[in-house]
Amino acid sequence: TVKDATGAVTAVTAEDFNQGIINSPEQLIQGKTAGVQISQSSGEPGAGIDIRIRGANSVRSNNNPLFVVDGIPLSGGNTTAEGQNIGVGTNSAKNPLSFINPNDIESISILKDASATAIYGSRGANGVVFITTKSGKGGRGGSWDFSSNLSIATVAKTFDLLNAEDYLEQSDFFGFNVAERNFGNSTDWQDYIFRTSASTNNNIAYSNNYGTGNVRATFSYGKNFGVVENTSLERITGRLNANQRLLNDKLKLGLQATISRVNDEVAPTGASAGFRGDLLGSAYSANPTWPTSPNFDGTGGLLSPATALAYTQNTSFTDRYLVNFSAEYNFISELSAKVNVGYDNSTSSRTALATKKARNFDQGAFGNGLGAINDLDTESKLLEVTLNYNKEFSNSSLDVLAGYSFQDFTRSGRNVSGFGFFADEFNEMGRDLEYVASEVESRIQGDYQQYGYAPNISDGIFVNRLFPEPATDFIPNLNSGLVRSLFVDTFDNTDELQSYFGRVNYSIADKYLFTATMRADGSTRFGKNNEYGYFPSGAFAWKIHNEDFVGDSVSTLKLRLGVGITGNQEGLGYGNYTQRERYAGGDVISDGGDINIPGTVILSFPNPDLKWEETLQYAAGIDFGFNNDRLNGSLDVYRKETTDLLFNVLSAQPATQPFQFQNLPGSKVVNEGIELAIGYDIIDTEDFNWNTNFNIAYNKNLVEELDGEFNAGTIRGQGLSLAFAQKLKAGQPLFSYFLREFEGFDPVTGQPIQNDIQEFVGKSALPELTGGLSTSWSYKDLTLSAYFAGQFGHYIYNNTANAFFTAGAFRGGRNVPLDVLQTGESFDAAADVSTRFLEKGDFVRLQNVTLSYNWPMPEDAFFSSLMLSVTGQNLFVITDYTGLDPEVSSSPGGDDLLNGLPVFGIDYAAYPRPRTFTLGLNAKF
């Protein structure tokens, strides 16, 4: 339990979860725990979420923690296929946890320090989030739970752009040809792509506890429509939890099974969109006198939002199955053994299409049509065996755990690209592309990596094979006439993780608690000389409140000390310690439909010494409570040192190999911080209760040692090719901004006054302070609760303004806010990457307010309980940031990351965060 823990562990139960529209489990606990930063990358339904527990450790991985669902460690990778570029950039993958129905969750525990996470060894460096689902409850005959809600969402904020009249007036004022700019309409393009959306979520559950066992079965259906046209997320889930005791309770059997289907619809948006922008960027910059006809061709090469909406479609489905079976046998009262078998499987396919009417799209879409199918299959199998010895002595207790686990992770799939479609209707285009790819595949004999055809390839369909030696051969062409050019790239990777672990807990007089943990992990991701890593930890806790010298008013007072080593293997990829060769992929089809048959490339070179990143953490904390914990809290301090950073390093030339995955020698990232959490039951009477909880955390991040410098943070926009805003270097925090210092505009020339070179500006995208405040008032059966969240000390690079809101953009015919034209900027000034677009990201948000009424029920009523609730989310935000929302970070696809480094703190036309109101009904019978 948390009270007996020697490490930093926080548990949040269902009654304290956030309410409203919840697409994934992380949102349930956002802001509830000190030192845990949870940020949704955008307001899009199912968008990815970044979680940082006690700072960011790694320079390559996403720094998210390990998620464990009912004892099954999840793979950590994406389970929804990323989208390919069909002319507006690539789509990032969605949240892999969206398959879990939040209503099925009983509690979420967060393991923060090394003494708590070391039992997970090489996967615990970023912390561990343990999700426990609900089990069967209720008496004879069982009970039913039903919940349903309806939500209405609107865009919380829009840009204050020029309307048609003002646009023409400003054009005339600055001497532009108004006749060429006036197309006779008055269009609010933000209003055109945004909408008021309605969403629903419905759950029904049967629960029964029949003495020797229990069962809980649930079914849920939810449909969340986004506030941007053509965006939605549909989730259908079923879950079964069953437990049975046999042989006089010596044998315990458990089964947890989830099946889900998530259907996703995405608008033509992409964090890697070109200078024209995507749907959002085009709506922010489109001429307000353009008509809303999707066939309008007077844009001067710019993208019309009407065209983007009408002639693109991007949909996906993800089927996922998560099953865990356990058997535990008690040989004697002190000794038990447990076997845990887990299986996690997902099948995902995304189809993105742009018809031949998609004017001003990249990659030759207009007049031809583009299509892409991305298939991703993941599978993970787990076998875990543990032996537990628990012995109570006269004045002490001993708990010993020893175990073995084996888990494999397989990822396979294909990426299909099509160019030049005969059809011009979405469903028909998708069917034709799937048919052509499958028909060609059925004709290929033997193993292959790639295949395709194009008009410029006269020998037929090329097939690239890797085994037994890389070779290209040809088979007869398909000649279907349905798709002019086709390219298919396949992949199939498997990783294995084998582990031995042990833990000893020893307690003396329920006052002095000792914990020692050791785990040895062996992974196929690393070199032969370092297949195994060893991760020890130790911790001590002193329950001071059990000492005789402590007064009765002190209900909890516990000192905790811990030290340990954990590891990280994420962000590395597959087989990168060996020399691995494959055929090049990417955008192989040219804008004209030709294909240059790809040749082989070396993806990695031998490095038998490649090993885990290691994080050494020291932590100390104190838990306190007074008057039966009416006032309670905790104070923690920590230092985390991550070394042996994994990186793809270019070799000094001349060299036999141009690059190699290495553990950077002497590399070290340090996080130091302090966390405070306080809860207080201010009023606690029979009829009226008022409680509040507050948490705040400070974290300082620094790259103390690093050999070399690495550019990061790609910036998008016209004239910004190869531009970047961040750099990784020793002496700076992660995600540090590297910019020109901007001091204004020359009053004579209107040119920017700024440095000629980029340099560190002493600012980072990582917040130094995070905090949350929740409070709840209840009077009899009426309850009102509110939750505030805040982040401070960080900066956001406003790439949206850099790309679209400049005087030069207005000269090019784009719309802008009025204040852009009042800065004195010359219309021919270059919009360089500079501190002009760097803004403070501090904010305080009223994230959640819920008013609920628990209807009193007579004993003979059909319903045992009935509750009605109204919830408002994202009601207001206090910030100086001029973008749509300060809690944002663009997430381009993995292939678009500069130097393979993750992006954080850069806002490029991110999907706006909605303001939502939800009416809910919960009934038990």
What function would you assign to each model-found segment?
Residues 148, 219-223, 514-526, 563, ...:
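Transmembrane beta-strand segments that form the barrel wall of outer-membrane beta-barrel proteins
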